[in-house]
Every structure is written in C-alpha cells, then in structure tokens.
C-alpha cells in the first residue's frame, strides 16, 4: 500500500521516520524524486547514528533533502504526506522488520485538511533540524 501510494505521488512527498530501513520504500521515494516530485524528510537522530541498515545515507546521496531531527528525545513519528492530500501514519516503521516480522498498522487518510495539519507538524520538526 505504501509503495503504491508513493509511486503515484505527483507533486510532493514529505516524511518523518523513526526507523527507516526499507529498501522498497526508499527506492520508491528516489524514483519519484528523479521524476521531479519534491521530497523532504526528517529521521530520528539516534536511529541515523546507529546506522543499522538505515536509508539516511542512501537518500542523502540521491540528493534528497533528508535531515536528522534536532530534539532531545526520540522523534517517533511515522508519517508520509503525499501531494498535501494523503497521510499515511500508524505504528508501522519504514523497516524490513515491520514488513516481515512485526504486527503493525497504518491508516491512510485522504483528506487535504488533515494533511495540512500533518504538514505543519513536519515543518515544525524540520525547522528544529536547522
């Protein structure tokens, strides 16, 4: 579901990720970025620092605006905002473990007003990285 929705993004993909080790999701994001879709993300600093198969470096090397969060605690969001109209969120980390072993959930919200609220939170979290 996530990759299918990302593959159909036309204008923008914003994401906040605690754990991001999914090659499939990373490849979908990179593909859309190559096609001109705006892509920006914030990932949890502790997870990036542990670098256990994470996608941070891969995305950064693909010239995607990906940053480490700047808060003292965990940046525990698991959110995609697609075309400022669709939100994907839930317990699901963007990880191989979530795909293959864990019981996880996501909810997909098709509502521009709700997407705008998530976008405000993304912008707040992103501003703390600077």
Model-inferred region functions:
Residues 2-65:
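Primarily the HKD phosphodiesterase
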Residues 2-5, 28, 54, 80-81, ...:
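Surface-exposed beta-strand edges and their flanking turn/coil or helix-capping segments
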Residues 5-6, 59, 74, 119, ...:
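Generic detector of leucine side chains in alpha-helical contexts
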Residues 14-18, 79, 118:
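Short, structured motif recognition centered on aromatic/hydrophobic residues
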Residues 19-23, 45-49, 72-75, 86-87, ...:
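Solvent-exposed loop/turn segments at secondary-structure junctions
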Residues 60-62, 67-71, 76-78, 82-85, ...:
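A post-motif C-terminal structural segment
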Residues 86-130:
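Signature of lipid phosphatidyltransferase scaffolds
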